[in-house]
Amino acid sequence: MFLTATALAVGALAGGAWTGSAEASDGAPAEDQGFSFEALVRKMKDKASGAYDPHTPELPQKFLDLDYDQHRAIRFQPERAVWKDSGSNYRLQAFHPGWLYKESVELFEIVEGKARPIHFTGADFAYRKPLNPEEFEGIDLPGIAGFRLHHPLNTPDYFDELIAFVGASYFRALGKGDVYGLSARGLCIDTAIAGPEEFPRFTRFYLERPEKGAAELRLYAELESERVAGAYRFTVKPGLNTIVEVDAHIFLRGDVERLGIAPLTSMFLYGENDRLGFDDYRPEVHDNDGLLILRRNGQRLWRPLRNPDKLALSFFGERSPAGFGLLQRDREFDHFQDTEAQYQRRPSLWIEPVKGWGRGHVMLAEIPADKEIYDNIAAFWVPEGDAKAGSEHRFSYRMIWGREPEPGTELAQVISTSTGHGGTAASDADPNLRKFVVEFQGKALSELGADAPLKPRLTIQNGALKHKQLQRLEGGSWRVVLDVARENASQPVEFILALQLEDADITETWMYQWSGNT
């Protein structure tokens, strides 16, 4: 359920360039209304006390009947972008409704403290073959599928895509030089439990009209589903790493088994640690290659991602984490060899709590996938305690999208994880004996000679260590080689590994899970 729904919600974005938008309504229509974030929070709290109304503006049947190719043939007219002639650093374009996007959203522009609707018509879009443009002439759009903001991110004379909101509560952003990769969500409810997942959706957006030359943009959103109502404030700050500050007020209508805060959604098909079963010229295929968690005491946990044989869940108990995120550490084109997907340019995303989040855990869900069109990785924060009907929750955090968004460190980092059958080159393959090769690199290690009293700090659960070797490689990186026998194939083998000098960690902590074949 999770895999399919996630893929449907964001798969169209992965397909390529969309555009769209219209001019904001002129004059002062009757719908103009005073706006403040405080009032929006009160509104959503009041809505949470009543039943959920899933009704959205009804779409014309011709929109509902669009298939994938027809929907992709609809492109926005760039010259009709909102704020195009305002001298602003931002332009807004809309995604056309239809195909998978049968629930429309509404957009409002905030001017001088008042919210006015932004209206779109068929004139804002180009209806290309195989569609007949005449069938869409003069048509009004009762709502849109979502929108994206453009900004001169890479060069001063071109408005690049910066951030896009489309499908449920999904959105994604870019840092300088990036191409779209992983997505974020406003909230996730009951992800990877025995029952169905619930997908809250952003139903209305309110965007402050950006001042001429303004560096940042602020927008607000209403979030709703059967068991939740929420008010969100986003402050977007483009740059080498694009920062999105989030202030989320969440009100529960019903009990929730697993409340996921700051959810991240990504794709890992195969990599150097896990590529069994893929006959592909590309050495690696993934949006991100690991989960990083930064603890308040400075300890850094690095968990390489996998594409498991069956659903795999990992839980990392924390008390007010300093941050967590899905990273793409591998930046070498030769490691991907994909001139179209450009996986080496996919952004990492770092979540940094603005205020203490208290006790809870970071959860990582890894879901089997056989194609790169499926997003099969999820990571999010689960606060401690019950999420009961009538409860209120507020979380503020900073999202950092880019090549290296995480804080710097003096600790050496894991630069590769490789696996294969255990034993020697002459050994027969044994499904219950596996080799793990972990390489660490950093100044703290490169300055050490081969005779340094460096030692591994190693813990293995549900497995037995058969062989261990520590090697200094040319260039100053260090490699740990482990042969491990599995005690029970039905139980995952868990690893914790760091390198120590004088009983103190000088590397981040590598964590891994071996289940099934990998």
Specify the residue positions occupied by each region the protein language model found.
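Terminal accessory/anchoring regions of large secretory-pathway or extracellular enzymes
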Residues: 25-68, 75-77, 95, 335-518
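Hydrophobic residues positioned within well-ordered beta-strands of beta-sheet architectures
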Residues: 105, 217-219, 230-234, 244-246, ...
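Extended, loop-rich substrate-binding clefts of extracytoplasmic carbohydrate-active enzymes
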Residues: 181-239, 358-370, 374
